[in-house]
From Swiss-Prot:
Binds as a heterodimer with protein bS6 to the central domain of the 16S rRNA, where it helps stabilize the platform of the 30S subunit. PANTHER family: 30S RIBOSOMAL PROTEIN S18 (PTHR13479), SMALL RIBOSOMAL SUBUNIT PROTEIN BS18M (PTHR13479:SF40). This is Small ribosomal subunit protein bS18. Belongs to the bacterial ribosomal protein bS18 family. It comes from Stenotrophomonas maltophilia (strain R551-3). The gene is rpsR. Part of the 30S ribosomal subunit. Forms a tight heterodimer with protein bS6. One of its GO terms (biological process) is translation. InterPro entries: Ribosomal_bS18 (IPR001648), Ribosomal_bS18_CS (IPR018275), Ribosomal_bS18_sf (IPR036870). One of its GO terms (cellular component) is cytosolic small ribosomal subunit.
Amino acid sequence: MSKFFRRRKFCKFTAEGVKEIDYKDLNTLRQYLTENGKIVPSRVTGTKSKYQRQLATAVKRARFLALIPYTDNHDI
């Protein structure tokens, strides 16, 4: 057996009973973005595939409406 035990990942949206992810909820969306603005994969976050698809769509809508930047690191 391994020396270290990892905590089991769980879907936060399933636990809270979320029906649909809202693109206007920026605090929730930012939890699933890296500091560069990329969407964190579900194998890292533990999000179910249904909610990962909704999350990706919500992030893309928020980016298009300029609620979230496409990238945070701009080298000048």
